[in-house]
Amino acid sequence: MAAITASMVAELRGKTDAPMMECKKALTEADGDMAKAEELLRVKLGTKAGKAASRVTAEGVVASFINGNVGALIEVNSETDFVSKNDSFIAMANAAAKLVAEHNPADIEALGQLAYEQDGFGPTLEDVRKGLIGKIGENMSFRRFKRFSGSNLAAYLHGSRIGVVVEFDGDAVAAKDVAMHVAAMKPVALTSADVPADLIAKERAVAEGKAAESGKPADIAAKMVEGSVQKYLKEVSLADQVFVKAADGKQTVAQMLKAANTTVKGFTLYVVGEGIEKKVDDFAAEVAAQVAAAKSGA
């Protein structure tokens, strides 16, 4: 059996960024063969990734990349907010956004097969993801992305949890302000005419319920419903919203854009974890389960 030295462990860690104890175990199993130990670690880290794959990822980051008229927005998820602040995780997200912009992958699976090496976990982005799962011990996933091309682009990231890309013609400063506005006010459409019919139907149903409870005559109730729907449309359409930086507190986004001779052709808003049902842990139940498992294994 070959002697496993501290320098060998350090060398393997430098190549794989795996935990020190995992490196020592791999070297011991490989009888000091560095190449074999490195391969053993890759397999082991991949196994850890498989075990973590079923765990919910509702935290994470939104990353963007823009180069001229080509850009991308991507959401990358983790299990905890702690991991979303990890430098390697953030680097992976930024790299993924760049790969989307440069290669236009068809879907998440195709994105994962693109070449990219980070922390010695390459050669593909999927290898990097699995390597980080093995290193950190948390599941992580590429949730969604969008690629943009052919238009002027402005991006805004609020921290790392909210990301916006605006497609526009005109003034770049005005477009950047709109991106910031979208992050703050979260409109669902450019104009009231673009608001999805299902959202309008839901709002109308709520308004009708309130009108029915009011006991007002039918004609007045109908006006109440229509008024509520119109108010909702103004609140959720970008053009009709009051611009967040309006000096008078009244100027709408549409008015601001007209003054800046700028047209917004579209926008995309990503909010980390939006629509993902988070797992709520019952700590007492978890402890009880662990105690029961320990007793059964004794």
Curated annotation (Swiss-Prot):
Q: Where in the cell is it found?
A: Cytoplasm
Q: Which UniProt keywords apply?
A: Cytoplasm, Elongation factor, Protein biosynthesis
- Any keyword Cytoplasm? yes
Recorded GO MF terms: translation elongation factor activity
- State what this protein does: Associates with the EF-Tu.GDP complex and induces the exchange of GDP to GTP. It remains bound to the aminoacyl-tRNA.EF-Tu.GTP complex up to the GTP hydrolysis stage on the ribosome.
Which PANTHER family does the entry link to? ELONGATION FACTOR TS (PTHR11741), ELONGATION FACTOR TS, MITOCHONDRIAL (PTHR11741:SF0)
Instruction: Enumerate the HAMAP family for this protein.
Output: EF_Ts
Family to which the UniProt record says this protein belongs:
Belongs to the EF-Ts family.
Q: What is this protein called?
A: Elongation factor Ts
Please state the gene responsible for encoding this protein.
tsf
